[in-house]
Amino acid sequence: MTPEHLPIDQYDAQLAEKTERLQSMMAPFAAPAPEVFRSPVSHYRMRAEFRLWHDGDDLYHIIFDQETRSRIRVDSFPAASELINALMPRMIAGIRDNRTLRHKLFQIDYLTTRSQQAVVSLLYHRALDDAWREEATRLRDALRADGFDVHFIGRATKTKIMLDQDYIDERLPVAGTEMIYRQVENSFTQPNAAMNIHMLEWALDVTQGSKGDLLELYCGNGNFSLALARNFNRVLATEIAKPSVAAAQYNIAANHIDNVQIIRMAAEEFTQAMNGVREFNRLQGIDLKSYQCETIFVDPPRSGLDQETVKMVQAYPHILYISCNPQTLCENLDTLSQTHRVERLALFDQFPYTHHMECGVLLTRR
């Protein structure tokens, strides 16, 4: 595979290989056959980051080969959304001959939505000034005049310049309901929007008929919490990053959801609060003991859950676990399977044409 040519004709074979590999990994836990969710074969990534290469008078996007670290020129990127592909040549054309915008520019980040909004971040190895703001505004306005709904951000050491805003609002159809999600630049969002819809709808399906409340650790912008709220009496969710908490609060209001409570604290702190080990001022007015959380949702980083968190989640009758690394999921299941059984298993092809697998399991207490 090259950045400008996807092996679309090999997609089915690669997905079959992933399915077989996941089944083999999950066999020791008596898991059912995985439900497999296909990705679009192109234009599936809603965000992308590129280095900029200055080659004499020329300027172009590059990425680095993961094995050789050699640079690869990228003029189009079919893995990315059509909007990113439309913006890439327009950004180069607008910057190449503009000394103010080009000087010491080393990276461009694109974040887009299915609703055709974009945030473009320009990263520099120099201080940014009013001249930069003026030229960036001129380029942004030219793109808007051509129909692009785009926002610009300039970044340098300890500097972030927003020309107007640093977010865009995504709209996802989830099981018959349109969900609005504010996505903030430089904060985590699911990269494959089509796969995100599949994950949300699968999570809704496996939690149908749930009793009690839902607890989610590290909820980000509320991606899963808000979609799942319709299946539970109440949802209690924790998140540590301020921009994500702010986005989650906006999303609660935008979606007219009244049964989700976001708490800004780490999972370890939350465990201490639930167990009465410590009191936290930020929990004033929130009666944790009134929550009857029978289901816990976790979507940990590639490293999986640490042993303390594994012990904590074992206390819940139902565990919904989304994993971006089946290897660490299996390590966690070595412990979790002692108390819980795997009821449902799903494979989400979040990253086509790579070895990466995203999967989901629903665990129920034995």
Curated annotation (Swiss-Prot):
Catalytic class of the enzyme: transferase
One Gene Ontology term from the biological process aspect of the record: tRNA methylation
Gene3D superfamilies hit by this protein: 2.40.50.1070, Vaccinia Virus protein VP39 (3.40.50.150)
PROSITE patterns: SAM_MT_RNA_M5U (PS51687), TRMA_1 (PS01230), TRMA_2 (PS01231)
EC number: 2.1.1.-, 2.1.1.35
InterPro entries, sorted: MeTrfase_TrmA_AS, MeTrfase_TrmA_CS, SAM-dependent_MTases_sf, TrmA_MeTrfase, U5_MeTrfase_fam
GO molecular function terms listed in the Swiss-Prot or TrEMBL record: rRNA binding; tRNA (uracil(54)-C5)-methyltransferase activity, S-adenosyl methionine-dependent; tRNA binding
GO cellular-component term (any): cytosol
Organism domain of life: Bacteria
Catalytic site: C324 (nucleophile), E358 (proton acceptor)
Record flagged with keyword Transit peptide: no
The UniProt record lists the keyword Transferase: yes
Keywords of this entry: Methyltransferase, S-adenosyl-L-methionine, Transferase, tRNA processing
Annotated catalysed reactions: uridine(54) in tRNA + S-adenosyl-L-methionine = 5-methyluridine(54) in tRNA + S-adenosyl-L-homocysteine + H(+); uridine(341) in tmRNA + S-adenosyl-L-methionine = 5-methyluridine(341) in tmRNA + S-adenosyl-L-homocysteine + H(+)
Positions contributing to S-adenosyl-L-methionine binding: Q190, Y218, N223, E239, D299
SUPFAM superfamilies in the cross-refs: S-adenosyl-L-methionine-dependent methyltransferases
Function: Dual-specificity methyltransferase that catalyzes the formation of 5-methyluridine at position 54 (m5U54) in all tRNAs, and that of position 341 (m5U341) in tmRNA (transfer-mRNA).
UniProt family annotation: Belongs to the class I-like SAM-binding methyltransferase superfamily. RNA M5U methyltransferase family. TrmA subfamily.
Protein known as: tRNA/tmRNA (uracil-C(5))-methyltransferase
Lineage, broadest ranks: Bacteria, Pseudomonadati, Pseudomonadota, Gammaproteobacteria, Enterobacterales
Gene that encodes it: trmA
